[in-house]
Amino acid sequence: MAHKKGVGSSKNGRESQSKRLGVKLFGGEVAKAGNIIVRQRGTVHHPGENVGIGKDHTLYALVDGVVTFRRGKENRSFVSVKEVVAEA
């Protein structure tokens, strides 16, 4: 009878929590200064005009405006925020 009995719960519970990465504001959406646009690991998307980058590579808006995505050299993805000028 060389076998283990029920071990169950002590062998379970190893799945890590999701990190909620991805694009938070898509192209054409309005961003306020400080809004997170993309949460990512590494620079999948690079910061363009009016976009800052955090130490964890999070991209965020530096000004109020509309989010745009474009492809640059070597097929790199750049995220920019086009400032919307208020008409007086």
Curated annotation (Swiss-Prot):
InterPro entries: Ribosomal_bL27, Ribosomal_bL27_CS. PROSITE patterns: RIBOSOMAL_L27. It holds the Pfam family Ribosomal_L27. One of its GO terms (biological process) is translation. The keyword Mitochondrion does not apply. The keyword Ribosomal protein applies. GO terms for molecular function: structural constituent of ribosome. It comes from the Bacteria. Keywords: Ribonucleoprotein, Ribosomal protein. One of its GO terms (cellular component) is cytosolic large ribosomal subunit. PANTHER family: LARGE RIBOSOMAL SUBUNIT PROTEIN BL27M (PTHR15893:SF0), RIBOSOMAL PROTEIN L27 (PTHR15893). Belongs to the bacterial ribosomal protein bL27 family. This is Large ribosomal subunit protein bL27. It comes from Parabacteroides distasonis (strain ATCC 8503 / DSM 20701 / CIP 104284 / JCM 5825 / NCTC 11152).
